[in-house]
């Protein structure tokens, strides 16, 4: 089963043991080093015991093998699931290697960067030839977005729209983090997946 643009396969070693093979997008299509980022991130957080272990990886083939996690998707979010997620994010911030990481994929450290990213995504969606989608974007989303941005701009600290958040206030983030990227084990413990976009980001985001 594929998540995003990566392809995932379950490889059965024997009757009781399996591993996960993840085939990442060609670097000619997406130049971001998603495989290496995920491998490095999972090695970084391995001692927290909330993520799959790295078994092996091949830079040339752009593939990696990971521990296969037995469990199911999170269909109903309970308080103890939220506690596990919050604790995991908090524990990541205490890792010694924190400052050596580059920024997460599509990280935003200023108001201008955030607006630029939203406008970029808006333009890409507008290129899709679908009347219902186009009407929603033009007549519903855009007016509301302009109204929200106008209000935000007025209430933002003066002369601070382009100022970037200092590194000391940034956090390590899995970026695409949430219960949609988690496996619930029979024990009730969550295992978090998909660290292809891991890096430093604004804690608000």
Task: Describe the predicted segments one by one.
Residues 178-180, 184:
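Catalytic-loop Lys-Pro-X-Asn motif of eukaryotic-like protein kinases
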Residues 97-175, 186:
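An alpha-helical support segment within catalytic cores of ATP-dependent transferases
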Residues 1-2:
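Protein kinase glycine-rich loop
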Residues 70, 179, 197-199:
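Short, glycine/acidic-enriched loop or turn micro-motifs at the edges of active sites
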């Amino acid at each position: 089963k594929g998540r995003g643009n990566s392809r995932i396969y379950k490889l059965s070693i024997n009757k009781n043991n399996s591993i996960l093979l993840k085939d990442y997008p060609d670097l000619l299509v997406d130049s971001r080093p998603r495989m290496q980022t995920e491998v490095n991130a999972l090695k970084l957080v391995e001692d927290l015991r909330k993520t799959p272990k790295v078994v092996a990886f091949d830079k040339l083939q752009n593939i990696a093998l990971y521990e296969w996690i037995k469990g199911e998707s999170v269909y109903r979010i309970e308080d103890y699931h939220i506690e596990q997620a919050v604790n995991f994010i908090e524990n990541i911030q205490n890792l010694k290697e924190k400052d050596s990481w580059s920024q997460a994929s599509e990280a935003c450290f200023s108001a201008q960067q955030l607006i630029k990213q939203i406008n970029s995504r808006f333009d890409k969606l507008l290129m899709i030839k679908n009347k219902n989608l186009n009407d929603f974007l033009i007549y519903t989303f855009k007016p509301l977005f302009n109204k929200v941005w106008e209000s935000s701009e007025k209430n933002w600290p003066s002369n601070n729209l382009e100022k970037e958040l200092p590194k000391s206030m940034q956090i390590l983030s899995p970026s695409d983090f949430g219960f949609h990227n988690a496996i619930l084990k029979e024990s009730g413990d969550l295992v978090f997946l998909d660290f292809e976009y891991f890096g430093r980001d604004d804690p608000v985001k």
